[in-house]
Design a protein with these regions (language model features):
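Non-catalytic substrate-recognition and accessory regions of acyl/acetyltransferase enzymes
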Residues: 1-97, 101-252
Length: 252
């Protein structure tokens, strides 16, 4: 990530010119990076076409890709993040805990570049049970009131730059966030009694369970209804960019 890395040489990939920059640290050697008791390959490529530094941790296709724009080295973007047991060199990365180890390793690696002050990502993960699928983002919101990356790594929602002042923002919060029970009641009125009971049972449970996805596959529709309810409440397009924050506050 730093163009002053000592092991710099030019090479070509698919005809596109790159430069590699390997970090030289006491706890790393030979293009390896350590995370807990696991070891991962890493590679940094400079892409002259996109003008980004592309950092691969683990397998180039299956694990993590981080990009840093050449003209904005304060921000790192995690473009791909996929768990696979072969991501570490010993090919035995465990499920669940291995996912967290892989991400923490990537964040620690990013922290070696002192200029980077912000890390962004988009959660597109899907939780699958047999033929049923649901976005992990939605499942965690309804279960914990936080997304997966909020709960496990401290990420925060990004909000578009808007003209809303801090005073206006606080006024909106006071109006729409205080009476949570009323909002929950309004939301649950959209569903049949048995679905409401199943939903209430689910949010009381302590762990994510695949049976929920099997028996309550309308959760994606519920999420859409919740958005529609919020849009009806706000009645103003300039507040649309606060919907994710509203969901987080309401379901916490």
């Amino acid at each position: 990530m730093n163009i002053s890395h000592p092991y710099r040489y030019a090479h070509f990939t698919n005809g596109i010119p790159y430069h590699k920059y390997f970090i030289s640290q006491s706890d790393q050697s030979g293009g390896k990076i350590f995370g807990s008791e696991f070891k991962f390959d890493f590679q940094e490529d400079y892409n002259n076409v996109t003008h980004t530094i592309d950092v691969f941790i683990g397998d180039r296709k299956e694990c993590i890709l981080i990009t840093i724009e050449e003209d904005n080295k304060k921000v790192a973007h995690i473009q791909n993040f996929h768990y696979h047991e072969t991501c570490d060199l010993y090919k035995k990365l465990p499920r669940i805990s291995g996912t967290r180890i892989l991400m923490k390793t990537a964040l620690e690696y990013i922290s070696l570049e002192k200029r980077i002050k912000k890390v962004t990502l988009t959660d597109k993960a899907v939780f699958t049970h047999k033929s049923d699928k649901i976005q992990l983002f939605i499942l965690y919101l309804f279960k914990y009131g936080e997304s997966y990356y909020q709960k496990n790594f401290g990420f925060k929602y990004m909000k578009k730059i808007d003209q809303i002042t801090q005073a206006e923002n606080m006024k909106i919060r006071e109006k729409h966030f205080i009476n949570k029970k009323k909002v929950k009641k309004e939301l649950l009125q959209y569903f049949a009694k048995e679905k409401v009971e199943r939903f209430l049972e689910f949010i009381e449970e302590s762990q994510l369970i695949s049976e929920f996805v099997k028996n309550f596959t309308c959760l994606n529709n519920l999420f859409d209804i919740y958005f529609a309810f919020l849009k009806y409440e706000f009645k103003d397009k300039k507040y649309n960019n606060l919907f994710e924050e509203v969901l987080y506050k309401k379901l916490k």
